[in-house]
Amino acid sequence: YYEEIGSTNDEAFRLGVQGAPEGTALIAESQSAGKGRLQRTWHSPPGANIYTSVILRPRFEPDLAPRISLAAGVAVAETLDPYCPGKVSLKWPNDVQIGGKKVCGILTQMKTATGVIDFVVVGIGVNVNWNLKEFPEDIQKMATSLSVEAGREVSRLELIILLYENLAKCYRELSQNGFAPLRKKWLDRTTMIGKPVSVTFGKETISGE
């Protein structure tokens, strides 16, 4: 537990390199350098949200590692469901939304050794009791918090316990039963099916549905 840290993912990665065991979890009250995908900043004010990273050491091939991020998305969605039934959805590849607005981001980082996974860090940031007026202007129209959508303040302790339980359950299911069961859960929640999408590889952009 950290009152303040640069980034829980950075610290978890450092601990992973040092040999920290699977299941090691870090949580912080605030981050001064929270990280999102594509080198974006994850806004991390103190005392309102959840910022956590978990170290996993899966026993499957590196090219299957992206499944961990999708499993984490399912775990987060199942955690938020009791607070906003029927409103939680998943947007490829790492966003959890409530009512079409982002409430959680997931960032996974992997270290490999001789063609196998050494460890994976799963970073999760959830907007919990963040007032919309406090959101940075550039994300106010696209982001929300659990308390705003639920209409009440949410116990972060209760939420983080439930999150860790669901994350452990989904990771165990992925490890023991493969991706198929989680894939169905993810597809049942995704907002992307049938929607126009564009994917950019360097200078090439591919569009489709």
Residue ranges of each PLM-predicted region?
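N-terminal lobe of the biotin/lipoate ligase/transferase fold
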Residues: 1-82, 102-104, 154
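Long, positively charged amphipathic alpha-helical accessory segments at protein N-termini or as interdomain linkers
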Residues: 70-88, 98-209
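Conserved active-site carboxylates
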Residues: 95
